Amino acid sequence: PGVKENCLFLKTKKDADLIYKNLQTLEPNAKVAVIGCGLTGSELIGCLLDKKKFNITAIDGLSGPLQMFNKSNINKTLDLWKTNNINIIFNSFVKHIEPSTIYFKDNKVEYDLAIWCGGVKISPLSQLINKKLNLESRRGILVNPYLQFQKNAFAIGDCADAGVFPTAQNATQQGRYLAQRFNNKFRDDQKYNYQDKGKLCYIGEKNSIFENKFISLHGKIGYLAGTIIHYFNKRFN
């Protein structure tokens, strides 16, 4: 209760613009709470940390941030956050939120601006489709290995439950897969196969963590790797 009424969300560019506008109005040492420390929340914390202006609180129901990364990279993130005096509240689920206060089961924290980066509720359209077709999923429209939920109907990205974590990397690959199938008029019978090309997260002070199935990087070299990856993505995609 109170999340929709009292929090900003970070899902779209429009959301990001609104957050930026609100941050500009805050006084020095204002209390900014970031709820959800996955990729989105952790990168936001890294960017806020760089401003050296806010008192930041990182909140998550799990035992730490970025649980999709290995333990070493998680610890590097925590070390950087602790060095910068970020208030860390983990293993704590939000009970309800009121103006200026976030309540947990046995605790509470005050805020001037709260940004929700936790799980995003399934869209009304996805809910409606699942209900009409008797599909059961809380993540999105339940699709088969061809990303179909009916013979000539497909779903990808955040609106689809394809059994893969809904990242931008996954959504891009899904889009390319369907584009290829549309272009060849579905003559092949190839199922969608997600290829994990690695995970990257900016954590603040020109430090990033990066890992794939071959290597794991952190710190300044992780940031350099991230800069190179972003360059090649813009240049060749």
Regions found by a protein language model. Give the residues of each.
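Rossmann-like NAD(P)H-binding beta-loop-alpha module
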Residues: 20-56
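Short strand-coil-strand connectors
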Residues: 105-107
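FAD-site-proximal beta/loop scaffold in flavoenzymes
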Residues: 5-28, 101, 110-176, 180
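C-terminal, flexible cofactor-proximal segment of oxidoreductases
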Residues: 174-237
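A conserved short coil-to-beta-strand element within the FAD-binding core of flavoproteins
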Residues: 90-101
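Active-site flanking residues adjacent to catalytic metal/cofactor-binding acidic residues
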Residues: 35, 59, 156-157
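Rossmann-like dinucleotide-binding cores of NAD(P)H-dependent redox enzymes
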Residues: 44-92
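Conserved Rossmann-like nucleotide-cofactor binding loop
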Residues: 40, 64, 121
